[in-house]
Every structure is written in structure tokens, then in C-alpha cells.
Curated annotation (Swiss-Prot):
Residues 16-32 have a biased composition (Pro residues). Regulatory light chain of myosin. Does not bind calcium. GO terms for molecular function: actin filament binding; actin monomer binding; calcium ion binding; myosin II heavy chain binding. The modification N,N,N-trimethylalanine is found at A2. The keyword Transcription regulation does not apply. This is Myosin light chain 4. GO terms for cellular component: A band; cytosol; myosin II complex. The keyword Repeat applies. The gene is MYL4. Keywords: Atrial fibrillation, Disease variant, Methylation, Motor protein, Muscle protein, Myosin, Repeat. It is linked to Atrial fibrillation, familial, 18: A familial form of atrial fibrillation, a common sustained cardiac rhythm disturbance. Atrial fibrillation is characterized by disorganized atrial electrical activity and ineffective atrial contraction promoting blood stasis in the atria and reduces ventricular filling. It can result in palpitations, syncope, thromboembolic stroke, and congestive heart failure. Residues 1-42 are annotated as: Disordered. It comes from Homo sapiens. GO terms for biological process: cardiac muscle contraction; positive regulation of ATP-dependent activity; regulation of the force of heart contraction. Residues 51-88, 130-165 form the EF-hand domain.
Length: 197
């Protein structure tokens, strides 16, 4: 018989080292705000009547400062024309529909009426625009005596420091002739004045 080979010694199984505690899960990244798709004027269906379009074209032409009357306005004038036509977009909304131009482009880039019309249609469909009642209600908060007026100085401060801040010159232009002898402003009349253009 063949001699038995000694069996190799089996090492005693060492206990596995205790697993390190799992690191705390990384905090989930903050969800990104959904990006609004870029505004595409070609995708806007125009619902205005021929008479309305003619009226809009006439108003648009009043803002045309090109030497030869090319029916073009600067990007910087777009919000003014929209407001002159009874719309009330925020500056941010105007910039969005213009493709978020750089500040230095606002008085250089031009917009023709055919490009402006879909912008006007889009803005006019926006239901988030403030109404007369919304603005009056917002100003009523500052009517400490419940007499239909707000202090002109307080309104100046609010317009220059909150929301879409206005420059001092813009505030003065807006409030020109609105204050009474006591420095108060009848806010219902003020809102009517602003919304009438």
C-alpha cells in the first residue's frame, strides 16, 4: 500500500473583521428647478383680429426710432410697447421671451413687428398678470389709516427696494403728480393711472 500523504492543515477560519459602519448616505442633491423651455415665437398661434393687428402695428410704429422708419424697436423697448398695449409683464418675463439677452444687448438688438406680434400674443395669454384688484389689495397693506391713501415716501421706498426694484428716476417719473399736499397718494386712483398707460 502506498504511504498516506499527510493532509495539509486547514487554517482555522478567521472571523471576518466586522464591517465598517456604512457611511451616512450623501444628502440627495437639491432637485433642480424645472427649466422652462425657451420661448419660440414660431410656435405661437396668433388669435388677434386684423383690426387688432393694425392697431398694434400703429402703436409699435410710435416706438420705432430707426432713422428710416424700418418698423423696428430695441429689445429694451419691448416691455414698454407691451405695457402701452395694455399688458403687464414683469421685466423677467420680457427678458425670457426675448431669449434672456445680455444687458449690453438691450439697446442694440432690434426686434421687428413680425417677431413682436407672437410675443404680444404669448404675454396676453399669461393669466398670472396682476389685475387692478391685485394691485389695490397689495397697496392696501400700506394704508395704515384705512382712508384709501398711502404715504408717498413709503411707496417710494417699496418701489425702489422690493420685488422688481425701480430706479429713483423711474419712481419719481411714476409718482409725478400723484401726491396730495400731505404727501399721501390715493392708491386706487394711482393704480388706475398706471394701468391706463
Amino acid at each position: 500500500m502506498a504511504p498516506k500523504k499527510p493532509e495539509p492543515k486547514k487554517e482555522a477560519a478567521k472571523p471576518a473583521p466586522a464591517p465598517a459602519p456604512a457611511p451616512a448616505p450623501a444628502p440627495a442633491p437639491a432637485p433642480e428647478a424645472p427649466k422652462e423651455p425657451a420661448f419660440d415665437p414660431k410656435s405661437v398661434k396668433i388669435d388677434f383680429t386684423a383690426d387688432q393687428i393694425e392697431e398694434f402695428k400703429e402703436a409699435f410704429s410710435l416706438f420705432d426710432r430707426t432713422p428710416t422708419g424700418e418698423m423696428k424697436i430695441t429689445y429694451g423697448q419691448c416691455g414698454d410697447v407691451l405695457r402701452a398695449l395694455g399688458q403687464n409683464p414683469t421685466n423677467a418675463e420680457v427678458l425670457r421671451v426675448l431669449g434672456k439677452p445680455k444687458p449690453e444687448e438691450m439697446n442694440v438688438k432690434m426686434l421687428d413687428f413680425e417677431t413682436f406680434l407672437p410675443i404680444l400674443q404669448h404675454i396676453s395669454r399669461n393669466k398670472e398678470q396682476g389685475t387692478y384688484e391685485d394691485f389695490v389689495e397689495g397697496l392696501r397693506v400700506f394704508d395704515k389709516e384705512s382712508n384709501g391713501t398711502v404715504m408717498g415716501a413709503e411707496l417710494r421706498h417699496v418701489l425702489a427696494t422690493l420685488g422688481e426694484k425701480m430706479t429713483e428716476a423711474e419712481v419719481e417719473q411714476l409718482l409725478a403728480g400723484q401726491e396730495d399736499a400731505n404727501g399721501c397718494i390715493n392708491y386706487e386712483a394711482f393704480v388706475k393711472h398706471i394701468m391706463s398707460g
